[in-house]
Amino acid sequence: MPAKFILRLTPPIEGRLAPLHKIWFNAVGGRMLKRKTRFLKTGKLEIRILKKFLERNTILDPRVVIGPEIGEDAAVIDPGRSADRYWVVTSDPITFTTEMIGYYGVVVNLNDIAMMGAIPKWFSAVLLFPEGSDLKGIEKVFRQIHDACHRFKVSFIGGHTEITPGIKKMILSGHMIGEVKKEKLVTAGGARPGDFLLLVKGVCIEGTSIMAREKEAELLKRGIPSSVIRKAKRFIFDPGIEVLRPARIACEVSSVHAMHDPTEGGLINGMIEMAWASDTEIEVDLEKVLIYKESRLLCQEFGMDPLGTIASGALLLAVPPSDLMPIRKAFRKNSIPFGVIGKVRKGPARVLRIDPKGSKELKPLPRDEILKIYD
């Protein structure tokens, strides 16, 4: 029986883009096979695709306690046996907006550190400016970074800045390092059956601010009052995209099993990431989720689901029933809104929406709803 072999034929480019498919020739059957390239949509990689890539990763250093894992907000490194603390390391870019990009960059990265029960300490950033940028604009971004670091007691320790050809708007990629006592480490994968699922503040906080900042003129044309737009712009400060404070309070008064800040893909993807990380089933009542009226209004204008919109400012907590009361008292004392929206169960890694009609599994969103404002 003749051996099968496959030839990959690559036509010459000749000053143009290569064809959008690859061609294989099966020598036995004499058939020409075309396989179309799958072009990925904007936004995070789908969870199942990312999981396949991460499974190929090899950790060479035994001091890595937590490496790249689905749902985890940061990596964890043990600096040595004599140390009583872990180093917690994260990276996060800002790509959806350019207004207040320096503030965004610091806060979304310190949020990731806070999710591990850690205190953010050191920040660095790669700042890529498009051609045509001026010194005034660059200075503005540096001022935003400086002010945010000063506010949250973080040291800005370096990075890289350049004018980059081929990009249309500025991109910031931030990197944060923090510390946590070894016995205080919290992970997204720590949720246990029987835990209550808490949501601190509401959803779509960051998305609401982005819509107002990026599409102000369009919203005004659609008849949205300027007062609503002004308030929505300030959502990054009030209710705020920072969750360091509520995370610290929760860790101080209770034995939090898991924390996660839902970002791209909103609350829906955030809960799914926690379920995957902890290998548990999460039951959620979406009617108990806080959605601000400004968020509902702006999402309606762009045909977006606030539950699937970038959600920095929200905080997911998995806590044992015995710790629910201490957290409730502490949050109320500090005027931090929260609600019990679900429960963690033993079962397959998934999220079930529970309502009077029954239950339905929530599927991961392939792209964040905020991208609809750019379509």
Task: Locate each region found by the language model.
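Acidic, Ser/Thr/Pro-rich beta/coil linker or hinge segments at domain junctions
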Residues: 27, 41-50, 58, 333-375
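Glycine-rich phosphate/pyrophosphate-binding loop regions near the starts of catalytic domains
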Residues: 40-200, 205
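Beta-strand->loop->alpha-helix junctions that form or flank phosphate-binding loops
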Residues: 66-69, 262-263, 281-290, 308-310, ...
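Solvent-exposed alpha-helices and their adjacent loops that cap or buttress functional pockets
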Residues: 67-69, 77-83, 149, 164-169, ...
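Active-site-proximal betaalpha loop/short-helix elements
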Residues: 130-132, 234-311
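Phosphate/diphosphate-binding glycine-rich loops and adjacent basic-rich segments that engage nucleotide
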Residues: 181-238
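Helix N-cap motif at beta-to-alpha junctions
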Residues: 319-324
